[in-house]
């Protein structure tokens, strides 16, 4: 069985990759996937602490986070489709043009 430190290190690496992706990418879909990666890193931390402490509360909280993430994905993808139909691009720098 792996120690909790291994799970936390993996979670920190995944969160860092997601953060770098959000800060450096311009494609909305890639940014969206990086945000989901960050959410999954946090979920991994909740599961690791829940297992380490022998408490099921963290696992229950992960189910709620996954439900909210699924709703966020549906709304986010719908917004991206609407934006693509309007501008023929999903570059985040083009979002400012929606004000016109």
From Swiss-Prot:
The chain crosses the membrane at residues 2-22, 29-49, 61-81. It catalyses: a quinone + NADH + 5 H(+)(in) = a quinol + NAD(+) + 4 H(+)(out). GO terms for cellular component: NADH dehydrogenase complex; plasma membrane. It is found in: Cell inner membrane. It comes from Geobacter sp. (strain M21). NDH-1 is composed of 14 different subunits. Subunits NuoA, H, J, K, L, M, N constitute the membrane sector of the complex. PANTHER family: NADH DEHYDROGENASE SUBUNIT 4L-RELATED, NADH-UBIQUINONE OXIDOREDUCTASE SUBUNIT ND4L. Keywords: Cell inner membrane, Cell membrane, Membrane, NAD, Quinone, Translocase, Transmembrane, Transmembrane helix, Transport, Ubiquinone. Its EC number is 7.1.1.-. GO terms for biological process: ATP synthesis coupled electron transport. NDH-1 shuttles electrons from NADH, via FMN and iron-sulfur (Fe-S) centers, to quinones in the respiratory chain. The immediate electron acceptor for the enzyme in this species is believed to be ubiquinone. Couples the redox reaction to proton translocation (for every two electrons transferred, four hydrogen ions are translocated across the cytoplasmic membrane), and thus conserves the redox energy in a proton gradient. Disulfide bonds: none annotated. The keyword Translocase applies. It comes from the Bacteria. Pfam families: Oxidored_q2. The gene is nuoK2. Belongs to the complex I subunit 4L family. This is NADH-quinone oxidoreductase subunit K 2.
């Amino acid at each position: 069985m792996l120690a909790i430190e291994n799970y936390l290190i993996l979670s920190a690496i995944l969160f860092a990759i997601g953060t770098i992706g959000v800060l450096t990418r311009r494609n909305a879909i890639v940014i969206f996937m990086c945000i989901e990666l960050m959410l999954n890193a946090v979920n991994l931390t909740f599961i690791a602490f829940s297992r380490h402490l022998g408490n099921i509360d963290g696992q229950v909280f992960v189910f709620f986070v996954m439900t909210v993430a699924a709703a966020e994905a549906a709304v986010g993808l719908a917004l991206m489709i609407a934006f693509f139909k309007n501008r023929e691009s999903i570059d985040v720098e083009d979002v400012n043009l929606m004000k016109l």
